[in-house]
């Protein structure tokens, strides 16, 4: 991939795939690798994240959220708004809630759909989504 930074390549490698283990240690390594990201790397990740498998999208959301930088908000918001996988959207929502991010009102329908889904499943993440809804701007 032309122009892809070393940090981005490392991050993708650390995320692994469905066949690789994912423990707290792996999450920490992936999250720490984001320290080396350039603005180009963040833009690339935002454009690529939705093409990852469900498993890797979820890992990506966890790592970006764990990193806690405003640079990652665009990636988490893209996963929340557009991932076809509701479990991924739920992780992204929880991470955005942890970061105390105010989301645009336009996301209300997606958040409400996600809240209904999580409530039906008795997921503790439903509270995170409820908080996001209450702070829409």
Region spans (language model):
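Structural detector for internal amphipathic alpha-helices that build alpha-solenoid repeat scaffolds
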Residues: 1-2, 16-36, 47, 55-69, ...
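Amphipathic alpha-helical scaffolding segments comprising HEAT/armadillo-like alpha-solenoid repeats
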Residues: 2-14, 35-50, 69-81, 102-117
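Helix-turn/linker elements and helix-coil junctions of extended alpha-helical scaffolds
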Residues: 53, 83, 119-122
């Amino acid at each position: 991939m032309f122009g892809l930074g070393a940090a981005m390549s490392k991050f993708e490698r650390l995320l692994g795939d469905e066949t690789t283990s994912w423990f707290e240690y792996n999450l920490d390594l992936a999250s720490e690798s984001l320290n080396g990201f350039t603005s180009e790397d963040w833009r690339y990740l935002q454009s690529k994240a939705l093409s990852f498998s469900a498993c890797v999208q979820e890992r990506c959301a966890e790592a970006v959220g764990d990193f806690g930088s405003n640079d990652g908000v665009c990636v988490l918001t893209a996963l929340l708004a557009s991932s076809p996988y509701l479990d991924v959207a739920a992780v992204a929502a929880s991470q955005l809630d942890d970061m105390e991010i105010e989301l645009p009102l336009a996301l209300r329908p997606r958040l409400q759909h996600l809240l209904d889904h999580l409530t039906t499943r008795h997921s503790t993440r439903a509270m995170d989504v409820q908080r996001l809804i209450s702070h829409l701007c």
